[in-house]
Each structure stands twice: as structure tokens, then as C-alpha cells.
Amino acid sequence: DKILVAISGGKDSLCMLHFLKEFQKKALIDFEILAVNVDQKQPGFPTEILPKLFKEWNVPYEIVEQDTYRAVAEKTLPGKSYCSLCSRLRRGTLYDSARNFGCNKIALGHHREDVLETFMMNLFFSGQLGSMTAHYQIQAEGLQVIRPLFSVYEDWIADFVQAQGWPIIACNLCGSQEYLKRREMKELLNQLQE
């Protein structure tokens, strides 16, 4: 297997890359990893951080430049979140990149709370019972998508990454986060867990 590890620069994707790299050293199966960051040309994105980190970690990497930010900004209505369209465009770029770089798997950094929040969003906003899965096939592309952190608590990831002192790139660069429905679901889940 050759796994494209999707790296945003956030805590989840960096934690995932670290553990895949550690697993690679001990695994009884042979696999390659390729860290890929999609540079969507968001204003203020610190482009120097990830290449430096990948070199320090001795991880093969590619930075794929795809100016989706402008398209998302133009097509998103005022008061709405960029996240859904931005995510779809980034995912398409990751699929293309996997093909171009000869990868048969894509690793995404979604964790337990992402799964629960997606379930709640589907329930409240679509009337459907469903969430993301730990892995799935994209038959037409010949790809498998995996989520190695699927059952890992977000707090555990945050604590681990903070203890490592890694540079984290915030996910609020585009300025549309205040309208995020996912934030509402996160707050609801926090209330339910108390």
C-alpha cells in the first residue's frame, strides 16, 4: 500500500501522521506514506511551517497548490460557512493527488467527536441516521479512504499534540467559522456528556 496522508496542519492530521510513521516502523506489513497538504491559497496561511516539519520528521511530502479559496469565497452566500464547499473541493484534489502520486489509500484525520458531530448534523439538518465510517472504497477511483483516528477522543489528540509542542495551523483562516453548524453540534454533544 501507498497511503496519501492528508495534512491540513491541524492537530488531528499531525497526530495521525506521527502515529502512522511510528506504526510503519513496527508493522508486520510493508507500506509507504506520503504526506500531502493542499494549499488552497487561503489568505494568511503559513506556507513555510509544513515543509519544515515534514523535513524534520523525514517524511516524504507534496504540497499541492489548488486555488479553491477564491471559488469558495465567490460561491458562498453571506452569513454561510465556507466549510462544506471547501471540504468537497479539497477532497476532489486529494483524490486526484492520490492517483497522480500512485497512492491506493487516503488517510483522513477525523476523530471520535467528528463522527458524533456528523451524526448529529445529519439527524438535525437532513433527517437521516448516518455518519462517517472508519473506511470506505471509492470504486470508480480504485481508492480506499481510511480514518485511523476514528475512535480516538479529540481531547486525547489535543493533549498529545500540546505535549509534543508541534506548530499547529488553525482552521479559522477563512473567517467563516462563526456560522458553522458543526460548532452547534459540538456544543450540544458537550452538554449531553456533562
What are the functions of these language-model segments?
Residues 86-98, 135-141, 192-194:
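Short, basic, helix/turn surface patches
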Residues 106, 113-193:
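Catalytic subdomain that performs nucleotidyl-dependent activation
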Residues 1-119, 125, 155-163:
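ATP-dependent adenylation/nucleotidyltransferase module used to activate substrates
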